[in-house]
Amino acid sequence: MKVRPSVKPICEKCKVIRRKGKIRIICENPKHKQRQG
């Protein structure tokens, strides 16, 4: 899980999800998991 000021999808399988006002990216590749800090 990477915490970054700006999150962007890295590949086609990355999905952008809003949870409790935070933007997250989930993907099949665990390295692509991100969350906005």
UniProtKB/Swiss-Prot annotation:
Gene source species: Caldicellulosiruptor saccharolyticus (strain ATCC 43494 / DSM 8903 / Tp8T 6331)
Endpoints of the signal sequence: none
Record GO cellular component, one term: cytoplasm
Disulfide bond positions: none
One GO BP: translation
Protein name according to UniProt: Large ribosomal subunit protein bL36
Annotated family: Belongs to the bacterial ribosomal protein bL36 family.
Pfam annotation, one family: Ribosomal_L36
Phylogenetic placement of the source organism: Bacteria, Bacillati, Bacillota, Bacillota incertae sedis, Caldicellulosiruptorales
